């Protein structure tokens, strides 16, 4: 839930971030979010073609890509083309995370429990959405929308630390 919390600290406030911090007009924000989604589709294509032979790089990117995007978005926001590039990278990162984590849940769950495991994963994911929006809201109201992505980045550091310390040894056997 921590990586999803990090994601939604930033993503829940991406529209006002892009308008206020990056200075984008409404129409550009719309197209940047379309690009974010299209980039996610690119991630799906790469996943389909490469995941079976390259589990580890996909897993590492799934854990670290969202945090990297959240970190880069703040300084990139001073230059609109850089902001657009980071948003595309972010779309790739979140879709990679979603695909890899769902695959891992299916892979590690006993066949008879896959449905329950996926339902549990969905519940945990939704907890991350809510907690990310909540934390992002606190940040937005207390110090400004421009810091929501950095708050998400800080949460992603905790998520990465937990993953590399506790979860990676279990996933990689």
For each of these PLM feature ranges, what is it?
Residues 34-38, 126-127:
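Short hydrophobic/small-residue motifs within alpha-helical transmembrane segments
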Residues 1-33:
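Extracytoplasmic gate region of multi-pass secondary transporters
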Residues 153-173:
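Multi-pass alpha-helical transporter architecture, strongest
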Residues 96-110:
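Intracellular juxtamembrane helix-capping segments at the cytosolic ends
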Residues 42-55, 140:
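Helix-to-loop junctions at the C-terminal end of transmembrane segments
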Residues 57-72, 153:
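Structural signature of the two symmetry-related core transmembrane helices
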């Amino acid at each position: 839930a921590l990586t999803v919390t990090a994601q939604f600290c930033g993503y829940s406030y991406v529209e006002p971030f892009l308008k206020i911090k990056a200075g984008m007009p409404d129409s550009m924000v719309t197209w940047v979010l379309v690009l974010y989604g299209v980039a996610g589709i690119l991630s799906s294509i790469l996943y389909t073609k490469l995941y079976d032979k390259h589990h580890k790089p996909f897993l590492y990117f799934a854990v670290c890509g969202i945090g990297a995007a959240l970190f880069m978005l703040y300084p990139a926001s001073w230059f609109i083309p850089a902001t657009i590039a980071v948003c595309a990278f972010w779309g790739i990162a979140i879709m990679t995370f979603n695909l890899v984590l769902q695959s891992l849940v299916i892979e590690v769950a006993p066949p008879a429990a896959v449905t329950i495991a996926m339902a549990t994963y969905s519940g945990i994911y939704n907890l991350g959405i809510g907690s990310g929006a909540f934390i992002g809201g606190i940040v937005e109201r207390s110090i400004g929308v421009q810091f929501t992505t950095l708050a998400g980045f800080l949460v992603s550091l905790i998520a990465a630390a937990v993953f590399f310390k506790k979860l990676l040894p279990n996933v990689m056997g």
